[in-house]
């Protein structure tokens, strides 16, 4: 995934499926300068946030870019 798509997903009202290492995640925010995104698991564990490289995020489904 690229940073422009991350920005679109974060600002979108739609529920867009995003995966990190095959696990469904929410994107909480991003660091454009370092090309990193802050994510947490979609299962609700908000306390398990981590920063991951944007390039390692994948979008799946009909809206994939």
From Swiss-Prot:
Q: Tell me a GO biological process for this protein.
A: asexual sporulation
What induces or represses expression of this protein, per its UniProt record?
Expressed only in the forespore compartment of sporulating cells.
| Family from the record | Belongs to the SspH family.
Q: Where in the cell is it found?
A: Spore core
Annotated GO CC locations = endospore-forming forespore
Name the record gives this protein: Small, acid-soluble spore protein H 3
What are the coiled-coil residue ranges? none
> Which UniProt keywords are given for this protein, alphabetically ordered?
Sporulation
UniProt main location, coarse: other
